[in-house]
């Protein structure tokens, strides 16, 4: 995949997975650590925090002195990979942020699990969101990733209401924040997308429509799935 040029205020779909498709999140603490890093390392003034110990709580007061490298518009963490929707705010902001995020989490994970070596499958992948099809469907695609954990595609035994309930129970994404249920509100910047999707209730309707017409929408973004 050709690497895009990162430019100011442009939106990108960023993703990566564990080396050899290994799990990169083994327990609740791992998910919380990565999300904690999404917040604390999104700062021009902060270097990578490699400490094993950290607070699970995100201090809202810290945001007052932050100089954001990127806006985190949406995210989903899966057992062996992650998806981020980022808008660059500082020169070279995405590269700086992803370097700090990857290094910081890898060192935490290796220290915790007494392992050595790379954790991720090479450099992060990036796709520029530069057309309407991507722009309208990528946020929901990112948020619906957890449904693959229940093997929902092609299944006739699980209806769309059950799938939505599953998404509401899955904490490790920004989906809940977009439907009006606070989960990790300090991490994301949601006003832009909520304006595009005309509010929380309408985004919920869009999500339900996505689930009902999964194969149709997947065809529109089949060039950005993990390979």
Language-model region placement:
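Short catalytic/metal-binding and nucleic-acid-binding patches
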Residues: 1-173, 178-183, 196-227
